């Protein structure tokens, strides 16, 4: 797949995933979701729809294939659309990329990797080509093998936070998985018996580090990828300084994860999972997390709702205290009162109205609070003029006398107001910081209230979880008979704790790789017991794995994304085409330069992570002053693909959707033709 197609797929997936917050987009995915008459004109999402139909909504995925259609259309879809209708806040307004948007960026780059495999296909190795390796690759493999030779296969019984991660057994430098070996492994998995080889080996031994190439490179890559994701999410993002006007409430993902960690009843969960009977196990889990206790004071919450509400309430209390402190600081200040009303007014606007104000902020190069203030004052002026015309004739006589009597009071009020207005100036640097701090708290407060209402104050989420557990009952039953769930939860608890401790310490990537290597034995042991003791369950999952791997094969027909990209490019005039190609060429060069810098800094060189860095760093946020150009989250960081998004993305999406519809129509005609022939 060429660079043009790859970049267009990346931009298209960003557009599609960010559009899921708009009601009606999910209904466009087709079955099992129900079409929406209310949002019939919603945009299509061709790439995400194709990924969902290829990997999730298949008859081979265990658990999902047992879920009734009503689960998706009557349970999950209404919950997601309800959250979408509440119009949660945008990162641009906060002045920094939110955790929610950061997770969205991570999902986009993962979907990009899947879409490249689905549309670009894996290239099979030629029969006369023998896998070769240079001395450097062999040395790296030997070093990786020796560094892992001492890793224990016993269960982790204590926290690794107190273990010296710089010991002699830890790698002194990063061992990047060989790209050539990975390509050989992918070809073996897609076109050969790579999956069966892996199953045979893991059924015999838990020592995956003794595997031969190229499958050993797959294990290294999995380990490496998990460590990179953890390091980026918990350290890299947290190390980026926030805007000076924002007051952090335990900033960083580890704050949310630690709050969740502290609210999970680990001991009770392990005790329930020790029950031998699978039916009692499912009943115990349902009672533990979903059963509501009796209450004399209205309807109570179950444990799941209480855990989520506790996480949201921490942000709710912090934002509320910030707003109260700001209001107290500028009590009886006329200009602050106007600004406060304007910010609260904006939080209650519809999505379209908020987008209009946001566009004014970008086009006029204004801070979002100034744009909101101007829009609010214009709306108030229009309302006042309308009301004044209606009352002008009836109040004319009385207003003259009233004005004469009230002249001294008006003058004194004006003088008093001017004195107070001196304390808060919305256009000053300090005023913008104060307004942004209050605005960030107001948006957070509204978001958390909406999430608490959707997830904790009604039973929609409970119904989704209950149906999900019913669909996976057989899987949980067989897995419970084959492996020790209680020990698995114990290992995961301490792994999560160590991730939190490393995150607080701002540990480098190497320590996260060491951490994943040390806990690798826990995960491999669990998989080993499932393969050995639950062959039927293992066979079901392997059928799905083979189905997924087959999608990367050239035998499976999918839209020709490269052809679509070049057809879309040819719809542009020569000048625009040259500009688009120049943008994409510059971006590819920047990726190469960033990869070289990453090697020098002992950081990850994965293409998907570089895309993730660029997504995060180039996200546009409101300027920090009253007048200024909107800036990216990180200085001098920008994807610089605006022309490509503006001119080429829509033709690419439309042509891709046409090919996808034609391919689906052919697939539907083929079974009917076979039936008529018979």
From Swiss-Prot:
Chief localization: cytoplasm
Keyword annotations: Cytoplasm
UniProt subcellular location: Cytoplasm
GO molecular function terms listed in the Swiss-Prot or TrEMBL record: phosphatidylinositol binding
UniProt-annotated stretches for the region Disordered: 123-156, 381-417
Keyword flag Transcription regulation: no
A GO-annotated cellular component: cytoplasm
PANTHER family, sorted: FUNGAL PROTEIN, PX DOMAIN-CONTAINING PROTEIN YPR097W
Protein name in UniProt: Uncharacterized protein C663.15c
Species this protein is from: Schizosaccharomyces pombe (strain 972 / ATCC 24843) (Fission yeast)
């Amino acid at each position: 797949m060429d660079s043009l197609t790859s970049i267009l797929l990346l931009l298209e997936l960003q557009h599609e995933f960010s559009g899921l917050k708009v009601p009606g987009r999910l209904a466009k995915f087709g079955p099992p979701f129900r079409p929406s008459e209310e949002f019939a004109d919603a945009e299509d999402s061709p790439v995400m729809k194709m990924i969902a139909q290829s990997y999730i909504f298949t008859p081979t995925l265990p658990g999902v294939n047992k879920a009734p259609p009503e689960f998706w259309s009557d349970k999950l879809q209404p919950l997601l659309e309800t959250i979408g209708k509440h119009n949660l806040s945008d990162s641009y307004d906060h002045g920094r990329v939110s955790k929610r948007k950061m997770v969205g960026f991570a999902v986009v780059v993962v979907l990009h990797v899947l879409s490249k495999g689905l549309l670009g296909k894996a290239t099979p190795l030629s029969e006369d080509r023998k896998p070769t390796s240079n001395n450097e690759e062999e040395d790296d493999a030997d070093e990786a093998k020796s560094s892992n030779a001492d890793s224990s296969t016993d269960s982790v019984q204590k926290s690794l936070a107190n273990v010296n991660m710089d010991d002699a057994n830890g790698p002194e430098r990063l061992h990047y998985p060989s790209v050539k070996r990975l390509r050989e492994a992918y070809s073996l998995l897609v076109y050969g018996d790579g999956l069966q080889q892996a199953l045979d080996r893991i059924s015999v031994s838990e020592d995956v580090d003794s595997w031969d190439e190229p499958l050993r490179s797959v294990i290294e890559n999995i380990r490496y990828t998990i460590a990179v994701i953890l390091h980026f999410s918990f350290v890299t993002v947290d190390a980026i300084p926030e805007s000076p006007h924002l007051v952090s409430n335990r900033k960083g993902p580890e704050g949310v994860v630690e709050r969740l960690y502290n609210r999970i009843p680990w001991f009770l969960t392990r005790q329930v999972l020790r029950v031998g009977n699978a039916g009692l196990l499912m009943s115990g889990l349902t009672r533990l997390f979903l059963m509501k206790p009796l209450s004399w004071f209205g309807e109570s919450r179950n444990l799941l709702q209480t855990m989520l509400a506790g996480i949201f309430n921490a942000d709710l209390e912090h934002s509320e205290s910030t707003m109260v402190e700001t209001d107290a600081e500028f009590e009886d200040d006329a200009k602050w009162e106007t600004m406060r009303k304007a910010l609260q007014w904006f939080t209650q606007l519809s999505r379209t109205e908020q987008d209009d104000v946001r566009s004014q902020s970008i086009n006029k190069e204004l801070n979002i609070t100034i744009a909101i203030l101007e829009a609010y004052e214009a709306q108030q002026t229009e309302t006042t003029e309308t009301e004044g015309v209606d009352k002008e004739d009836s109040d004319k006589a009385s207003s003259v006398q009233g004005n004469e009597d009230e002249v001294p009071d008006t003058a004194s009020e004006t003088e008093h107001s001017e004195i107070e207005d001196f304390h808060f100036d919305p256009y000053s640097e300090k005023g913008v910081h104060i307004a942004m701090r209050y605005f960030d708290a107001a948006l957070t407060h509204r978001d958390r209230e909406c999430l608490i209402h959707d997830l904790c104050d009604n039973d929609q989420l409970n119904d989704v979880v209950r149906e999900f557990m019913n669909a996976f009952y057989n899987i949980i039953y067989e897995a419970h008979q084959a492996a020790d769930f209680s020990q698995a939860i114990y290992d995961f608890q301490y792994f999560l704790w160590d991730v939190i401790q490393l995150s607080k310490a701002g540990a480098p990537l190497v320590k996260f790789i060491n951490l994943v290597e040390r806990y690798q034995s826990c995960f491999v042991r669990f998989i080993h017991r499932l393969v050995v003791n639950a062959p039927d369950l293992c066979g079901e999952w392997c059928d799905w794995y083979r189905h997924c791997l087959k999608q990367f094969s050239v035998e499976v027909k999918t839209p020709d994304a490269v052809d679509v990209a070049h057809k879309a490019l040819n719809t542009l005039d020569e000048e625009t085409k040259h500009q688009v190609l120049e943008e994409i060429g510059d971006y590819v060069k920047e990726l190469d330069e960033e990869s070289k810098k990453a090697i020098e800094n002992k950081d990850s060189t994965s293409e998907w992570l570089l895309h993730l860095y660029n997504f995060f760093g180039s996200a546009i946020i409101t300027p920090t002053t009253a007048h200024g150009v909107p800036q990216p989250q990180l200085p001098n960081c920008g994807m610089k693909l605006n022309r490509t998004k503006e001119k080429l993305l829509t033709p690419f999406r439309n042509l891709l959707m046409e090919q996808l519809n034609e391919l689906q129509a052919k697939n539907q005609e083929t079974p009917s033709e076979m039936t008529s022939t018979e």
